[in-house]
């Protein structure tokens, strides 16, 4: 979780005091908790009805992992109905203790930030330890296992996700960089785009799937990376009459990437797009501050940008092929929504990657 504030430089002391007080000393009113629970229930219903990709990604995590990563991002209705101020206060006491908090900033000097933050965090630490007997929670564990989840829908459209483990997650810098570049290499999107080359029209899923198979509505790469693990794969949608063909097409694209190196020109284009994305994002101070915080939580320090740039530049067609082969050697995770009767069995799809 992240809390942020954006202010003019002279107002940093006041903003920091407000931010630390809101994060570390929150007050939960019963009516506020009830209103928030109602909004979350509405968000969950909206995702179910209008965001099949988001719903499938939730389902994919549920079958791909055991442990914390298998739990839904949007709380089930039965959990929301039991939500109370006391539960939220206990959660904050256990998880928002200063030893587990990273304060990151951009546009302010490090020494100045430390001098401003130290008394605020020390005060909160002493007050929280005296007012709460809760012990800090251990980092949750998750294990990748793979699996299958299918939900019937009479919408006439079948949505599909095929995913594999990106073992090592963010802490495996070469591996996470390969996943990032792979997402640009595969690219994809919807069957209609008003864009041009800058919109990824030369990516593999556009040129090899969407441009060749008019019945495919959507085909795009996805990735969800965490500290020590992650998911990488392809999301696609088509008319239900083409559901079985959709599995064939997506499977073949992933198998080909794992079996032979991509042309050097394609990889260089994907690497250039990844480099551009990384460097352009870091032009924003808000992104820089978030990046510092995330890296300190993940690596214990902030790595220089050059380390990621060098890792991207070092990728070769052979190393990209090896990275995809490593991922597709893990158990398949598959999620589908639509005419599931027309889809091949999980064991048949998984066997294609053996």
Question: Where do the protein language model's features map onto the residues?
Answer:
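Short, flexible/disordered intra-domain loops and linkers
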Residues: 189-197
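Soluble C-terminal extramembrane regulatory/interaction domains of multi-pass membrane proteins
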Residues: 145-146
């Amino acid at each position: 979780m992240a809390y942020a504030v954006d202010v003019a430089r002279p107002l940093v002391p006041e903003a920091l005091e407000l931010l630390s007080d809101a994060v570390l000393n929150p007050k939960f009113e019963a009516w506020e908790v009830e209103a928030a629970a109602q909004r979350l229930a509405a968000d969950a219903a909206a995702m179910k009805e209008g965001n099949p990709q988001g719903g499938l990604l939730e389902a994919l995590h549920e079958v791909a992992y055991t442990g914390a990563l298998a739990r839904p991002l949007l709380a089930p209705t039965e959990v929301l109905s039991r939500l109370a101020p006391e539960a939220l206060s206990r959660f904050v006491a256990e998880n928002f203790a200063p030893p587990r908090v990273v304060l990151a900033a951009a546009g302010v000097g490090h020494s100045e930030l430390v001098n401003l933050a130290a008394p605020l965090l020390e005060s909160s630490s002493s007050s929280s330890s005296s007012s709460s007997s809760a012990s800090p929670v251990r980092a949750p564990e998750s294990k990748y296992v793979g699996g299958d989840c299918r939900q019937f829908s009479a919408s006439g459209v079948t949505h599909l996700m095929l995913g594999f483990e990106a073992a090592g997650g963010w802490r495996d810098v070469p591996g996470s960089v390969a996943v990032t570049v792979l997402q640009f290499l595969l690219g994809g999107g919807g069957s209609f785009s008003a864009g041009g080359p800058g919109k990824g029209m030369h990516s593999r899923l556009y040129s090899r799937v969407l441009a060749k198979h008019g019945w495919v509505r959507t085909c795009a790469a996805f990735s969800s990376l965490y500290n020590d693990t992650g998911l990488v794969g392809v999301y696609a949608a088509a008319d239900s009459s083409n559901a079985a063909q959709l599995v064939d097409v997506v499977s073949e694209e992933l198998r080909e990437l794992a079996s032979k190196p991509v042309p050097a020109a394609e990889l260089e284009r994907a690497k250039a797009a990844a480099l551009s994305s990384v460097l352009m994002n870091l032009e924003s101070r808000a992104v820089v501050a978030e990046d510092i915080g995330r890296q300190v939580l993940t690596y214990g320090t902030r790595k220089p940008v050059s380390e990621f740039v060098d890792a991207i530049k070092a990728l070769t067609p052979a190393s990209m092929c090896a990275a995809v082969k490593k991922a597709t050697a893990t158990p398949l995770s598959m999620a589908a929504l639509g005419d599931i009767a027309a889809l091949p069995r999980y064991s048949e799809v998984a066997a294609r990657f053996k």
